[in-house]
């Protein structure tokens, strides 16, 4: 069977052991996150070759190969708090879980409706400062920011505020556990990306035009913790790259005495069709080990 490859992978990372990711505990084999919005995915292998050289011209006589490395790189169009946690080893705080509240930063332009007071969209946090700056008719700052005093509910008191004046407000507010929900990602200096069991399903098309299920399995991959977040107002939207190094380990459902860096499974069942193959993960055909 010969085939061509022109399809992206859907990737799942599963817990290798009972482990915590982003503040949540996953048992061995439990899926941590599915990646279904990838733009590219690449498996790259490399080896180091050294040679015995000699004779006239010092030509190569014998070669030795070793230091085999395998890397799986995927580029995701979308990002989630959990994927950030996987990439960086960060902890997640969910305002809906437990009693811990998240303090959020907000800015708002407000026109004075009541003498000496401003009405905000959110209730200012009791322990946080509120700063206001008066704006002119063109929306420019007219002076330095001054501290306001918290009032009742969403109201703050601003000395000298006249009806019709406009202020720019910088303040903080808390999640309330009901309507206002938030997630917080904490990237710590001593936490890094972990090890996972990777399965990447895709389609290989044979010479008859039939798409056959194929799967890359890396039984032990370590997520590199390097990352770049690019923000721009023009051009293509940012993508997010995950690079994982493969380490030898046995397959979860295979010969436990044989360690591999990667296993590639290709289904060559002649009775399958395109629709069935696109959703199947059965591998009745050859398995290629690296």
Residue ranges and their predicted role:
Residues 66-71, 159-168:
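Extracellular interaction modules
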Residues 59, 156, 179-180:
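Low-complexity, intrinsically disordered segments exposed to solvent
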Residues 11, 130-132, 146-148, 155-158, ...:
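Hydrophobic beta-strand residues in large extracellular and virion-surface proteins
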Residues 1-87, 140-148, 214-241:
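Solvent-exposed edge beta-strands and adjacent loop segments
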Residues 76, 165-175:
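Short, hydrophobic/aromatic-enriched beta-strand segments in well-ordered soluble domains
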């Amino acid at each position: 069977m010969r085939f061509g490859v022109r399809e992206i992978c859907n990737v799942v990372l599963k817990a290798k052991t009972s482990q915590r990711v982003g503040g949540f505990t996953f048992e061995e084999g439990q899926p941590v996150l599915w990646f279904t919005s990838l733009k590219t995915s690449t498996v790259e292998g490399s080896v180091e070759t050294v040679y015995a050289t000699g004779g006239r011209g010092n030509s190569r006589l014998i070669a030795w190969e070793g230091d085999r490395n395998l890397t799986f790189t995927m580029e995701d169009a979308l990002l989630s708090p959990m994927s950030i946690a996987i990439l960086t080893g960060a902890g997640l705080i969910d305002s809906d879980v437990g009693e811990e509240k998240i303090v959020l930063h907000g800015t708002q332009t407000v026109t004075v409706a009541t003498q000496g007071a401003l009405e905000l969209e959110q209730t200012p946090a009791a322990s946080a400062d509120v700063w206001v700056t008066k704006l002119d008719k063109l929306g420019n700052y007219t002076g330095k920011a001054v501290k306001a005093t918290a009032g009742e509910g969403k109201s703050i008191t601003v000395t000298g505020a006249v009806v019709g004046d406009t202020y720019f407000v910088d303040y903080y507010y808390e999640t309330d556990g009901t309507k206002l929900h938030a997630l917080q990602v904490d990237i710590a200096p001593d936490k890094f990306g972990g090890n996972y069991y990777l399965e990447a399903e895709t389609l290989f098309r044979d010479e008859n035009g039939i798409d056959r299920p194929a799967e890359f399995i890396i039984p032990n991959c370590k997520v590199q913790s390097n990352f770049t977040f690019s923000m721009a107002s023009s051009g293509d939207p940012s993508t997010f790259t995950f690079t994982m190094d493969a380490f030898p380990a046995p397959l979860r459902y295979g010969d436990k005495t044989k360690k591999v860096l990667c296993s590639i499974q290709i289904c060559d069942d002649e009775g399958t069709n395109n629709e069935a193959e696109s959703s199947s993960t059965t591998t009745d055909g050859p398995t290629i080990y690296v």
